[in-house]
From Swiss-Prot:
Belongs to the osteocalcin/matrix Gla protein family. This is Matrix Gla protein. Keywords: Chondrogenesis, Developmental protein, Differentiation, Disulfide bond, Gamma-carboxyglutamic acid, Osteogenesis, Phosphoprotein, Secreted, Signal. The keyword Coiled coil does not apply. It comes from Bos taurus (Bovine). Residues 51-97 form the Gla domain. Residues 1-19 form the signal peptide. Requires vitamin K-dependent gamma-carboxylation for its function. Associates with the organic matrix of bone and cartilage. Thought to act as an inhibitor of bone formation. The gene is MGP.
Length: 103
């Protein structure tokens, strides 16, 4: 019985020591963590923004066919549900291939 009491006291002390909440994590040393709208994108140069837009356009133009099929299927709810069971290729074939005349 004494060992059980001693064990429970040690467990309570361990829980109290491990669950101590420090208020330091709640404090912020910054006066204002937000920046205004003018300075929000000032850390990215205009050339980097242009390069990112150009790369995005290239990625959009060079998408593989299965990705284009998947995007078309995602916009149509029935096709998306069918794809969850049978896969995107089967769903695209069922809902879109017949409309375009391909077999």
């Amino acid at each position: 019985m004494k060992s059980l009491l001693l064990l429970s006291i040690l467990a309570a002390l361990a829980v109290a020591a491990l669950c101590y909440e420090s208020h330091e994590s709640l404090e912020s040393y910054e006066i204002n963590p937000f920046i205004n709208r003018r300075n929000a994108n000032s850390f990215i140069s205009p050339q980097q923004r242009w390069r990112a837009k150009a790369q995005e356009r290239i990625r959009e133009l060079n998408k593989p066919q299965y990705e284009l099929n998947r995007e078309a299927c995602d916009d149509f709810k029935l096709c998306e549900r069918y794809a969850m069971v049978y896969g995107y290729n089967a769903a695209y074939d069922r809902y879109f291939r017949q409309r375009r005349g391909a077999k």
